[in-house]
Amino acid sequence: MKFIIMITVGGRFLCRLWACLVIIILHSTFSILHSKELTDTIPLTFEYNMPVVKALINGQERRFLLDTGSSASILMLGTGDDYVLTGDSIEMEDAYGEREMTGYTQADFCLGCFEGEKNFYFMPYNEVLHGLFDGILGMDYLEYMGVVVKIDVKRGHLIVTTDKRLFNREKRKKTTYKRDKTDRLPKLKVKMSPGGKVKNVLFDTGFNEMLELRMEDFERLMHSRRGEDFRQQLTGTAYGGNQGTALQQRDSVGRTNFRLKEMKALKTKLYDIDAHAEVTSDSKLGAAILNHGAVIIHARKRKIYFLPNGE
């Protein structure tokens, strides 16, 4: 009996030892695989209330606007730029109504440690970007690379990683956005609490304000069943220094400026928000929200995580 007990105890010890060895082996294997993930921290500036990073195009440093409101990446061609232009040329109209030829170009692109050949739509270097940036990095780049990015204006950096678990321990608020069927851009919901909500709001870091409502969405809120609640949110609008009701304050292009007492976006409440309504194709949540916290974007999973400042 004692012999059997000793064997049983010894067997349990060996089983535990074997289990520990298996765990160590699996952990080591995972660590090796995990170490193959790429991560880089890239300096980011917040210019004109928009996120800007530097990248290399064919070895030449260029400044790119990180724009979630653009489905394509765009390169502005300057004098002396030497790129291999490919594809059919497209005639388009610039900001001054002049017609220009454009198309797309292939270039060696390097953002931190992430490099490879990438297609860019090219445009003549004109006033489309007001001469402020050399190009745009759109949602196509995030989806094509399969990376997760963290835009952190407070710390002044952009973290780009293929490690999907890198930010798991950070306290964050998750929003699953809807991908537009036409341009695949991120659309989400914004609440005016109280006072209703607006669906299909474009999350657009290439828009340097906080909130822009389509005039149709604005009018619908004003005349909805909760229209009175929404109107109470409007703490008085000012256009050209005048006070009055929101519907009265319009300029020649149909813009209405107003201020919201409270708004909920990316699962976060924000207060005293300057906003406006305008005749435009989409309601937009803009890059000004990056002043209130960092944003993590996982484009392939259609997730946006918001990390409010101070939490």
Where do the PLM segments sit?
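Generic recognition of cysteine residues
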Residues: 15, 20, 110-113
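Pepsin/retropepsin-fold aspartyl endopeptidases
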Residues: 35-311
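Bacterial N-terminal signal peptides
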Residues: 18-29
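N-terminal secretory signal peptides that target proteins for export/translocation
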Residues: 1-15
